Every structure is written in structure tokens, then in C-alpha cells.
């Protein structure tokens, strides 16, 4: 049941706007025959367990990834196209805006710091590629050499960047089934993230 919403001014009340909206949605949903679609099993299971959608029709249909485009390519060629170093291990981080707290950059920075501390040779043989807005704002906080790539809209460039990476890291605090994981895996790049 949705009530007493902490997002509302003064913390909400027992019969605040969130309660009224919840009750209205429940009435509309149950009387309309809507069939809901979730893009991941986790999101589908969460929706099925919610008090708003319990008992309603719901299917899971993952977002499509074109595996003719997002597929393994020659790493050396991909690195030439992406201008990333040919002779280093590459850890890839991707986010629309890398400074968004929920995307987990603070955890990524800490993890890279620990890796560099325990494996000092990484400073010579490993680099970070950061794809997304505000990437240049975090470079100085990373203990390994970093390449802020900014936004990339060109699909071929994006595929080259994924194929350049040795590992894709997604330390987000909340995601359902992000395309970045699917694209990375389709390119044959292992993904590491929180459960």
C-alpha cells in the first residue's frame, strides 16, 4: 500500500496524495484489462509482488539488442577505431551521466583504488574507459589512467568501444536490465556488477 510518502512535503500523512493516487490507479488498473509488460524478470517479479499489480496480467519481454550489430569483433581493430590503447587492459564504465549517485561511481572509484593498491602493476598495464556525460569530472579521482569518452551516439563507435574492453563494470545501486549489460555481453565482454 502506498501512503505516508516521504517524497511529499512534510513527509506525507496517512491519507495523503500518494494514498489517493494509489487507490485511483488500483481502480483503473483492475477495471481496464491492461496487460503490463516488464523488461526484466526481476522487474516482472517485483511488479507481481507489488500491492498495486498483484493478480493482474503481466509479461516479461526484454529490450531487444541487435546481435548482428552488437557482436564480438577483433579487439585490435576495435581499439584502433576507438583510439583506446592497444597494449593495455581496459575496464569500461558506461552511464548516461557518470556522476549520478545511483550509478555507483563512488563504489567504482573505491574498487579501482583498492585494485591499484593491492596490484600496483595495474597502473602500468590497465586503463579505465569512461563512456557518458561528465566523465571528465571523475578522471582525477581514479587511481588508474583514464580515458573520458563523453557521449557516443554512433552505434559503430559504441560497438568498437565495447569490443575494446576486457571487462565491463556496472556498479549501479538500482537497475532492472540495462541495455549496457546486454550490449556488453552481446559483444563478448564479461560484465561485473552488484546483484
Annotate each PLM feature:
Residues 74-90:
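Nucleotide-sugar donor-binding and catalytic loop/hinge architecture
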Residues 123-125, 132-159, 167:
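Nucleotide-activated donor-binding/catalytic signature segment of Leloir-type glycosyltransferases, i.e.
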Residues 173:
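Aromatic "clamp/platform" in nucleotide-sugar-dependent glycosyltransferases that forms part
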Residues 190-193:
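Short hydrophobic beta-strand element within catalytic cores of glycosyltransferases
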Residues 85-103, 109-113:
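Conserved donor-binding/catalytic core segment of Leloir-type glycosyltransferases
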Residues 166, 188:
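A short alpha->beta transition loop at the rim of the catalytic pocket in nucleotide-sugar-dependent
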Residues 14-60, 65-69, 75:
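A short, active-site helix/loop in glycosyltransferases that binds the activated sugar's phosphate group
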Residues 159, 178, 182-186:
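Short alpha-helical segment that forms part of, or immediately flanks, the ligand-binding pocket
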